[in-house]
């Protein structure tokens, strides 16, 4: 946000990887000459050439007189260097502005810079007794319309969306962001034995929406057919007879995918948790009871033996959505990372 004479004259944000950073977008959107203005940024301006030129360069050229910064950039290529360059050019800086609030906004970026897998969040809808489907597998719909609309906003915020083959076979989803001006996330399907149908919505739209299928299958004929339809095949090592989910995430990180929203079933969720790959959870909770020991839960598998082994969450936030509630929280160990 750029301010001059106590008026906001420009705003901007980093819209996508490879696109203009927030500072350059804000300068581009200025309604008048920003010379002598002040700028407020959540993250220290970059000072190196990457996919875009340094933002420090743009601020100097624009004649900005002061920069207010929420967080210093943990990227070793920046890490205080942006502040130094601005100061060396006579631009005043002040850091630590709303530092904690800015850290929360920058969670995904900070994690991406400091870790070898993307920031990974589980999303599921469940009843008050913790069921994501009935004993017969029926799950449409657990939550109401407002909660389901909110999911599409959430998808828009993540670079990729992951699901297991069980979800694809049961629901034939599109896994896109159906909101105005929404960005469709890259779709990642964990399909160990390539059971996905060539007639599924995922495969039929693979040329419109980037689609990755992670597998351990060596079925070259099926692989060739899926590739012809536009799917990218990601081969991984085997873990317990399935794709190695941590390896999948590492490969996604190498593709510069910074965040993954997981909309899988209990088996995929359990695998991710077991491999320490979960950083946040979004639980949409409906005021309903299903019951039944065979009804599916958000996390399958053997479960833990001792309470001390439980995954614990902090920074909890509850949001009413019609008759439902969205409860979100961050895994405690992930808070220590940032």
Model-derived regions, located:
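Short beta-strand scaffold segments in enzyme catalytic cores
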Residues: 1-6, 124-125, 327
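Active-site ligand-binding patch in enzyme domains
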Residues: 111-112, 121-128, 132-258, 267-270
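Short gly/pro/ser/thr-enriched loop/turn and capping motifs at secondary-structure boundaries
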Residues: 74-77, 100, 169, 195-197, ...
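Residues at the N-termini of beta-strands
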Residues: 66-67, 160, 259, 280
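Flexible, gly/pro- and Lys/Arg-enriched active-site loops
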Residues: 273-313
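Conserved histidine-centered catalytic loops in small-molecule metabolism enzymes
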Residues: 218, 301-338
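Residue-level signal for inorganic ion chemistry
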Residues: 46, 86, 130, 164, ...
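Zn2+-dependent cytidine deaminase-like catalytic core
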Residues: 2-101, 186, 212, 273
């Amino acid at each position: 946000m750029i301010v001059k004479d106590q008026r906001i004259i420009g705003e901007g944000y980093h819209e996508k990887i490879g696109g203009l950073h927030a500072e350059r977008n804000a300068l581009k959107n200025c309604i008048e000459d920003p010379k002598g203005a002040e700028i407020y940024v959540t993250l220290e301006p970059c000072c190196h050439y990457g996919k875009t030129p340094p933002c420090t360069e743009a601020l100097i050229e624009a004649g900005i007189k002061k920069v207010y910064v929420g967080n210093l950039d943990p990227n070793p290529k920046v890490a205080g260097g942006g502040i130094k360059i601005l100061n060396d050019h006579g631009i005043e800086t002040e850091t630590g502005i709303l530092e904690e609030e800015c850290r929360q906004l920058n969670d995904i970026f900070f994690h991406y810079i400091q870790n070898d897998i993307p920031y990974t969040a589980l999303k599921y809808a469940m009843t008050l007794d913790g069921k994501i489907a009935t004993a017969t597998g029926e799950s449409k719909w657990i939550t109401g319309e407002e909660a389901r609309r909110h999911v599409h906003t959430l998808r828009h915020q993540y670079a990729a969306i992951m699901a297991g083959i069980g979800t694809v076979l049961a629901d034939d989803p599109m896994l896109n962001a159906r909101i105005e001006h929404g960005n469709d996330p890259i779709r990642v399907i964990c399909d160990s034995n390539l059971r996905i149908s060539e007639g599924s919505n995922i495969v039929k739209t693979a040329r419109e929406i980037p689609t990755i299928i992670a597998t351990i299958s060596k079925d070259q004929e099926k692989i060739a057919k899926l590739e012809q339809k536009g799917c990218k095949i990601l081969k991984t090592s085997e873990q317990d007879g399935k794709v190695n989910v941590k390896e999948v995430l590492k490969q996604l990180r190498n593709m510069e995918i910074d965040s993954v929203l997981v909309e899988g079933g209990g088996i995929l969720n359990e695998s991710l948790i077991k491999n320490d790959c979960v950083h946040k959870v979004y639980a949409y909770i409906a005021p309903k009871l299903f019951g039944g020991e065979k009804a599916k839960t958000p996390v399958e598998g053997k479960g833990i033996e001792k309470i001390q082994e439980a995954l614990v969450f902090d920074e909890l936030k509850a949001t009413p959505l019609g008759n439902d509630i969205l409860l979100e929280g961050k895994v405690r160990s992930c808070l220590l990372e940032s």
